[in-house]
Amino acid sequence: TANEDIEKEFGNDISSIVAGLKRVKGLYEKTPAVETENFRNLLVSFAEDMRVVLIMTADRLAAMRRLRDVEDKEARNRVAREAEFLYAPIAHKLGLYKIKSELEDLAVKYLEHDAYYLIREKLNATKSARDAYIADFIRPISEKLTQAGLKFHIKGRTKSIHSIWQKMKRQRCGFEGVYDLFAIRIIIDCPAEKEKQECWQVYSIITDMYQPNPKRLRDWLSVPKSNGYESLHITVLGPQNKWVEV
């Protein structure tokens, strides 16, 4: 059989991955609604081998990068929708956050063309001001955390095009109306048994410095996400009355 030929030529590992890709392809062909959480879970279980899922995700990312070459608009939209609703959540679950963001942003580019270019233009026009703002916001936090004897990594970023577009739709506002364009990530470097305590210590330091919005507190330390993700999220009012997610 073909599987035996592959195994003989390339070994058991490659044969197993090819078999997984075939199983997933068969599942695709039988399922009309692939943009659901049920199908996502089914797809991962059918793959049986995480390498199969990684190959599929990489393949979809490559397809999205070449999508402008596809002339059939319906086919293009289907590929983009699957990237947004099927592959981006899988990438997120695997901790592949850059890939998740790229898949989502490219999906907006093809599904919401005008919105994508409007947001991109606005982001490009305000980049230097945003970078300066993030640096000013981070500096005093870094000083306070260092004074507290904490070991940490801190970095700031502007939300992705996809994230901003979702907020614009949810809040029914223009780009200027999105109130938390910025996100700061603080990663604590400490023994596992001290993680929760130090996370809450960082939370306390930040909310002493900046006014928090209690409605925006997300506690995934007490109840971690299903993929094992543990963190605290809070939105605070930074300089110039701008909201920042930490």
Where are these regions (language model features)?
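Nucleic-acid processing machinery
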Residues: 26-42, 47-53, 60-245
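Histidine- and acidic-residue-rich, metal-dependent catalytic cores
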Residues: 2-28, 84-89, 93
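Acidic/His-rich, divalent-metal-binding segments that scaffold phosphate/diphosphate chemistry
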Residues: 1, 9, 58, 111
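Short amphipathic beta-strand/extended segments with alternating polar/hydrophobic composition
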Residues: 12, 245-246
